[in-house]
Each structure stands twice: as C-alpha cells, then as structure tokens.
Curated annotation (Swiss-Prot):
A family per Pfam: PhoD_2
UniProt cross-references to CDD domains, sorted A to Z: MPP_PhoD
Name of the protein described by the UniProt record: Uncharacterized protein YGR266W
Miscellaneous comment in the UniProt entry for this protein: Present with 3230 molecules/cell in log phase SD medium.
Source taxonomy: Eukaryota, Fungi, Dikarya, Ascomycota, Saccharomycotina
Superkingdom as given in the UniProt entry: Eukaryota
Biological source species: Saccharomyces cerevisiae (strain ATCC 204508 / S288c) (Baker's yeast)
Gene3D superfamilies: PhoD-like phosphatase
Membrane-spanning ranges: none
InterPro entries the UniProt entry points to: PhoD-like_MPP (IPR018946), PhoD-like_sf (IPR038607), PhoD_2-like (IPR043904)
C-alpha cells in the first residue's frame, strides 16, 4: 500500500468539536435504537507478551433484535511514516463469538466478543478496523513495539452525581483525551473505578425506590426480594450501560442534571481499556455499610446484578454459568482470583488484574470492591494469592515499573475527626429526626440511616476500620518493590480532585548534633531518588466528568496535609505540584490539591524523547533535575543545577513522566487543559529486607 493511503490525517480536534456542544444536556428518551448495533465497538486490553511478542485484547459489539453476527476486519501497518513510499499492510478479520444473550424490553440483545491476537513488531503499529464494512475515523488503535513500554492514561469518576447542575460544565475532557491521543498514541487506558455512575437506580427501579424510602427498619431489613424487583434491577443495569457505553447518555434527579459524553464513546473504540470497579459502578457506598444492611435481600440483588453487567461491559466476559464462558471468566491469564469462598455479598471471587504493558512495565489492578466489607477490603487468603502472582511475574523486572490501580487514594489526609463526629451519640437526636423526615432530611442516607457522608469516609484507606490493612498493604508494596528493584507507582481516583501523595525514605531532622552518617544519609535520599527503595508516588486523578469539590474542601485538605511517619524509616506526605493556578501566574495556597476536573497520563521517558511534539511541549531531557509543577507554552518545569531539595526529581532514561491534565475553564467547549508534571525515576538498587519498626497498627519488631 502507498504510504499516502495509509497515513490519513485523523484530526479529532476538527472531527469531534461539534460532539462537545450540548454535552451538558441529553435527550428526554433513551437513544438506544430498536435494532442493529446498539453499543460498541469497545476495546479491551488483556496482555502483551513480550517473550512471545504477541498482543492480546478483545472487541465487544452489542446487537438488538435479530441475531446478526457483525464482521470485523482489520488492517495492520506502521504507526509512523518512514522514507519508504510503499509500506506493508496486512489485512485479516478478528474471530468472534456470541458469549451472552440478554433481553431488553422484550427484545433480544446479543453480546459478541472478538479476539485480538496480533504479532508485535520492532516498530509501533497501527490497527485500523471496520465493523460490517464501516470504518469510522476513530476505529483504530496502536500496538507498541516489542521493545517499547506503553503510553497509558489513568482516569476515574466518569459521570455525574445525581443532583449535579451539569449546565456549569460546557466542556468534555474526553475531547481533550482524543486530541492528545492523535500524537501521543496511548496504548492503554486504565479505568480506576466509577467508569459509570449507577446511583440513579434509586430513581428508575420503582420497587427498590419504595423499599429504600421505607421508614420502618424492621420492615426494611426483612423485605424479601420479588421476581419483579429483580427484573427491574436487571433491566436498569442493562439499559443504563447501553445508554452510557453506547451513547454517553445520562440524566439524574433534577431537570439540570443531564449529560451526553459522545467523545467518551469514541474513546472506547480507539484506546483499549483495563478496568477495575468502585462503588458508583454499583451504587453509592456499596460494601461500606454495616453487615446487616449489606445482607438485606434487595441490596444483595443490587450488588450481584451490577457485578454481572460490570463483567459484561467492562471486562467482556459473562459470569453466568449458562453462557459457558467459564474460561474467559475464571481461567484467563490476566486474572488474579481472590478468596475461593467468594464475596459475602456479591457471591463471586474478586477479579484483580495483572497485565504487562512493556518489557519494563506492568500493571496490577486490585479489585477492591467485590470482597469489600465495612471492616475488611481483602481477606488474608486473597492477599496471599495476589502477592504470590505479583512476585512470580516481576522477579526479573529490576529497573522497571509496576503501576498499581487502587481506586481510592492510599496517601491522603486523615479525616478521623469527621468519622468520630458522624458516629458520635451526640448526633443521635438529629439522625432520628432526619430518618423520620422531620428535620434535615438529607442529613442521613436512605440506606441504613447513617450520616450521608459516612460511607465515603468508611471507604477510605485511612478510615479507622482500614488503617491496619492499609499499613499492611503499603508495607508489602515497599518490601516487594525493594526486593526486586521495581518502582511501584499507585494510580487512584475517587475524591474528585487531583493530588500526588508520596511515601519516601525518612529525612532525619531535629538532631541537636547531626552525625556525619545521618547527614550523608539525608544527602543520599535527596540527591539519589533512584536509590530510594521506599519511594512510592500515589497519583490521584479525579474526576474526568464529575463536579469538583468547593475551594473550602481543598483548603481543609491542605491544612490536614501534614508530614506523617509511616514507620521509623518512611515519611508520608504530598508533593506541592499545584503551586500555581491554571493561568500559570497566580500562586495557590492549596499547593497539594487541585479541585478542578482532570485526568492523567504516564509516558515512559524514552517515548517522550522520541516524540517530537511531546518533547517540545514538555521541554525536558535525560539528566534534568526538575521541580514538579505546571508546564505551559510560556513556562517549563523549573530545573536545578543540583538535586538540593526534597521536592525535585531527575529525568532518567528508565523513568516515567506523569502529567495531570487539569481543566482550564469548565465553561469552554474547547475543553483545554493545563499540564502539571512529575518525573518518576526508576529504582536502580535492591534490598532483600526492609525495616518497618515503628509502624502503627501492626505488630512489627
């Protein structure tokens, strides 16, 4: 094929500009057509095998009406032009199978999954594909070379809360994603939870709504789930996913709570996804209510139906035994299955994910929702299964990176005083009046009558119920990273603002007479982060769609953002990456927290330097020592002659470069973002055993 025919000018900025207009509104009725393809194509990444040099993934298409097996053909060729005018382009088709049949309003719904298994080359490749002969401009994705680590996106909170006034948000950050994808070539998009907001099940499942509004606790806790209720819940999740994943269509509880995210749907077809789920994929707070409420029949049904459709739409597998999809559901090699007993509420094993993203890059997505209870996120057995798999996979990854998807931030300010207040007996009279609807009706939730915000606090790793488990998890991550010389970076969302938490080797202070040994150790920690075996960043990117919290919340978090001693050798704090406003001029007091909509990407330094546009935009080179912060056309990262302060990091050949893309102005349809950047150095040393003396809540000697 001639190069000019292959390298077309795919220009998302021009093609999808009109798709952003009206993203603060939606049609009154569902956009799902009565027949034909009603959802998809949706791409999913399974794994990259750099020994066998194979790329594995899947495409899902959903059809309504008559059974009609769509055909997906593809072309595989180079992603970038070379000196050759004629290039080799291979053509074939993806093998598909019907893996699930469903019913929506008496119509048959057919789920088709197509296996992607492609050879990797010594250069990055582009795949263009067509569905039943139709090749849209965005029907394409990129396969890295077998020597290349992937460019990835991390995002969360992909939807609005029920009563948000969406008229305040004229832009779509998914438009920004597509514009950058044109020249960055993202190989994977990591969904950190809340890919869909399902809280409106309370509005659209009548029997569930009536049950939730029941004031009599005895009646509420003893209600049996009827077949009609089950069917309403099932129909809700199926239609809700088809509306959102097929058309970006959603409406909430007020006339001003509407959105149509068309660019999200296009992103599903051009960037393969790896997803874990969180509470809003089910219903707000699921797993963080008391055990007696979680075990009510109606709430068990909600969790189990949400799980079924999460698996179908986000993982492209069927959890139903009658579909015969057992291999994909339980035996596919990307899964790390949890405790054999399964979840107490959902009744299934947790599905954490391990995938390779490059010869020196892997990802671990922890399923922190399926097993979740008020007092436990994972069982001991599940942790042992996770660590066994991770150690087996990364034992030869020295100098590489492990990205850990952890939906809820783990390096985040403590709000214990709020937990104490919300559970205090002092509030009992107000809670009673609120439950009865006499006073402050929104003060308590309609589930179990707890204070409305308590489930959010109970979800957090720093909640009093989870502190021990949190510290155990961080300790294990530090131990494994140090043992194998792997830099671990945690990717989180959930909190509707951006931040960068940090664990690092302790800087010794407050010595009346600082010993020479301590001074040398401090110098090493500051000047050689590549040798800091305790260094773990927690990149928090949230929300790509939902509304950010008010300025007062960012101010509160900044005041609570103190230096903590995780153990005697590890400090925990946050990186002041947001020292300037998005205009690049005005200073921010809340330097560790940015309460604007955002998403993030993680680019290997080698890829960055080989990309002319990225290299020009970011303006860094190997050997630079930079202070994390804002990058604009007029302003690059501040560079230092020496690494003489704790918040500066080197740009290294084996490192990563993470950018949090923060929305400039939510009222503008151009959806422009501003970049806040941080280099993440690789780990060049190992340590067989770390000391964790002084760690709280664990008996470590």
């Amino acid at each position: 094929m001639h190069a000019t025919n292959w390298f077309d000018d795919w220009n998302p900025e021009a093609l999808y500009r009109d798709d952003v207009t009206g993203c603060d509104d939606c049609s009154e009725t569902s956009p799902i057509p009565k027949s034909g393809i009603i959802c998809g194509p949706i791409l999913r990444l399974i794994n990259m095998d750099f020994k066998e040099k194979t790329y594995e993934g899947s495409i899902m298409v959903v059809v309504r009406g008559e059974e009609n097996f769509p055909k997906i053909t593809y072309q595989l060729g180079p992603s970038l032009p070379s000196e050759d005018e004629d290039i080799e382009v291979n053509e074939a088709f993806f093998e598909g199978k019907l893996f699930h049949k469903d019913i929506l309003k008496d119509d048959n719904i057919w789920f088709y999954r197509y296996e992607i298994k492609l050879p990797m080359s010594n250069y990055e490749q582009m795949v263009k594909y067509a569905v039943d002969g139709t090749m849209e401009p965005h029907y394409r994705f990129f396969v890295p070379s077998f020597t290349q680590n992937s460019n990835v996106i991390s995002y969360s909170c992909n939807g609005f809360s029920l009563s948000v006034d969406t008229s305040k948000f004229k832009g779509s950050l998914w438009y920004d994603v597509l514009k950058k994808h044109r020249y960055v070539h993202y190989h994977a998009i990591l969904g950190g939870g809340d890919q869909i907001y399902s809280d409106n099940i309370k509005l659209h499942a009548p029997n569930l709504k009536a049950w939730l509004e029941t004031k009599d606790p005895i009646k509420k806790y003893n209600t049996q789930t009827t077949e009609e209720t089950k069917e309403q819940i099932r129909q809700f999740y199926l239609e809700h996913y088809l509306n959102w994943y097929g058309y970006g269509h959603w409406y909430g509880s007020t006339p001003k709570s509407k959105t149509t995210q068309k660019c999200f749907v296009k992103s599903l077809a051009c960037i393969p996804a790896i997803n874990v789920w969180d509470d809003h994929d089910i219903i707000d707070g699921y797993g963080s209510y008391n055990d007696s409420f979680m075990k009510t029949e109606n709430f068990l049904t909600v969790g189990r139906m949400a799980y079924r459709y999460y698996m179908l739409f986000q993982q492209h597998v069927s959890a139903s035994k009658q579909d015969g999809d057992e291999y994909a559901y339980l035996k596919s090699k990307q899964w790390i299955l949890g405790n054999e007993k399964g979840s107490s509420y959902i009744g299934e094993r947790s599905h954490s994910i391990f995938s390779w993203l490059g010869p020196k890059m892997a990802m671990l997505g922890l399923d922190c929702r399926t097993e979740r209870k008020l007092h436990e996120i994972f069982s001991e057995r599940s942790y042992s299964l996770i660590w066994e798999r991770v150690e087996r996979e990364i034992k030869n990854l020295k100098g590489g990176h492990l990205l850990l998807m952890l939906g809820i931030p783990i390096a985040y300010p403590r709000l214990v005083w709020l937990e104490w207040l919300f559970t205090s007996k002092l509030l009992a009279p107000i809670k009673y009046l609120s439950k009865k609807g006499i006073f402050a009706s929104g003060f308590v939730n309609e589930f179990n009558g707890d204070v409305e915000l308590l489930d959010d606090l109970n979800d957090h790793w720093c909640a009093r119920h989870h502190k021990k488990e949190r510290n155990y998890l961080i300790m294990k991550l530090q131990d494994i990273g140090a043992k194998y010389g792997v830099r671990i970076t945690i990717l989180s969302g959930d909190v509707h603002l951006a931040s960068v938490g940090r664990f690092r080797a302790k800087i010794h202070r407050h010595h009346l007479i600082m010993s020479e040994e301590k001074e040398k150790e401090n110098t090493r920690i500051i000047e050689e982060p590549t040798k800091d075996v305790r260094l773990i960043f927690n990149i928090i990117a949230s929300a790509i769609v939902n509304t950010p919290p008010p300025d007062a919340m960012a101010t509160l978090l900044q005041k609570r953002c103190r230096l903590h001693h995780f153990d005697l050798e590890t400090d925990e704090d946050a990186v002041p990456i947001f020292a300037k406003e998005v205009d690049g001029v005005h200073k921010r007091k809340e330097s560790c927290f940015m309460n604007k909509r955002n998403w993030s990407d993680i680019i290997p330094i080698e890829n960055l330097l080989n990309n002319p546009q990225l290299s020009k935009e970011l303006g860094v080179k190997v050997g630079d020592i930079v202070i994390p912060g804002i990058i604009t056309e007029q302003q690059k990262l501040q560079k230092l002659e020496n690494d003489d302060q704790i918040n500066s990091y080197p740009v290294t050949s084996g490192g990563l470069f993470t950018t949090i893309h923060v929305e400039r102005d939510a009222n503008q349809t151009n959806s422009q973002t501003v970049s806040y950047c941080l280099p993440i150095p690789e780990l060049t040393v190992t340590c067989e055993r770390l000391s964790h003396k002084g760690i709280k809540h664990l008996n470590i000697t």
